[in-house]
Amino acid sequence: MTYKEFIDINRLLRQKYIVENPEEMLKDVDFNQLSLPSNTRVIYLMGSKSDVLDFSKYEQVEKILIVGARKVRKIILPQKDCVKALGISSMTNLETIENISFHKGMRYMHFDYGVKLPNFSFIRDLNQLLYLSFTANKKLPELDFIHPSSELRFLDFVDTSIFNYATTVSYLKSLKHLRFLTTGRTSQKQRDLLRSELPHVCMREG
């Protein structure tokens, strides 16, 4: 597979599962004081005036993208399996995501640019995920939070330290459906090991 084909597949997945339309963006609002239609399917926020984002009443929401909401410590999702895509970027004080384990049908998730959740154990319950990105998360823990039976096809570890763990390659090797891996910067020794242990995975550095 060529580099362009790799990028095209990545782009198609993001377009399918996450919204990035500036026309639908809510900027620096107190979201909990808003009254969106109950059948809202897409929520795109940039910034937040509240330290809690409560989406629990939107039981038809499918896509949530939150960027730069640095005040937010807690996100509350609906107690119903409805969210198919969750994107969280530049939220350095986020501590918890309530009800996320209800959303077993989730297909896309990214935690990018300094999201400092204390752990990612909830991902073990989300076995239908296809795409998972941790771009620029320097303190990412070991990968025991990803279940071997996961349907994950695409993993992104650009600008992380994940390959400093001796266990990383064995965890990746256990993911039978993994096909695309963005490693970020790695040493020649690490690249050789990855190619040897993951011969069926298409890889790029970034």
Language-model regions, residue ranges each:
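Concave beta-strand-loop units of leucine-rich repeat
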Residues: 3-95, 99-118, 122-141, 145-206
